[in-house]
From Swiss-Prot:
Keywords: Amino-acid biosynthesis, Lyase, Metal-binding, Methionine biosynthesis, Zinc
Listed EC numbers: 4.2.1.109
Family: Belongs to the aldolase class II family. MtnB subfamily.
Purpose of the protein: Catalyzes the dehydration of methylthioribulose-1-phosphate (MTRu-1-P) into 2,3-diketo-5-methylthiopentyl-1-phosphate (DK-MTP-1-P).
NCBIfam families, A to Z: PRK06754.1, salvage_mtnB
Binding site for Zn(2+): 103, 105
Catalytic activity field: 5-(methylsulfanyl)-D-ribulose 1-phosphate = 5-methylsulfanyl-2,3-dioxopentyl phosphate + H2O
A Pfam cross-reference name: Aldolase_II
Source organism of this protein record: Sulfurihydrogenibium sp. (strain YO3AOP1)
Top enzyme category: lyase
Protein name per Swiss-Prot or TrEMBL: Methylthioribulose-1-phosphate dehydratase
Cofactor(s) this protein requires: Zn(2+)
PANTHER family linked: METHYLTHIORIBULOSE-1-PHOSPHATE DEHYDRATASE
Stored InterPro entries: Aldolase_II/adducin_N (IPR001303), Aldolase_II/adducin_N_sf (IPR036409), MethylthioRu-1-P_deHdtase_MtnB (IPR017714)
Amino acid sequence: MPERLYQEEKQKAVNVLNDLKIKLYNKGFFPATSGNLSYKLHDDPLIFAVTTSGKDKGTVTHEDVIFVDKDGKPVEKTKMKPSAETMVHSYIYQKTDAGCVIHVHTPANNFISYVYFEDGKVKIKDLEMIKALDIWKENAEIEVPIVDNFFDLKKLAEEAGKAINPDVPAVLIKTHGIYCWGRDEFEAKRHVEAFEFMFELMKNLIIFKGSKDIW
């Protein structure tokens, strides 16, 4: 690819991630520098932009984004470090048609992942918001996989990668957060907003009924 076009793609990726992180930060999805985002530039070889580690998502600087390969290694010389969970993003890109990945930590997704962890998944059914996932079926039902929050991030990435279901654009990590993806930034944002809406509703139903058996 000509250098000029490559630089244009890189700048687009930076712009997309900066815009997206501010929008989601303003929704309260990135407390205490948590979470990360990425945007794919190329499939073969896999190259994607990912937010750098430990940065406040509510601000924009020239050190917020780094470009990495499928092994999570920087493709250019840099002093910046990619997010510690970059390999989860890589597995998602390798196993799905994702063009953008979003990872957020919220009270609702932590609650749901804790309550349903022993089941290995959380069932969601009969909610209108499922349509936001491009699932248009009567009595629609989906299952979001839940994996343990391994301290070893390599192990975490491997287990999350194994759990990925290309038909359901999300994986939950127990008392940690959710990874959502879409074919582009618009779809990924829509998906994460839909899941967070459904998890908040489910949390309230569990509390109201006094049971996790809400369906």
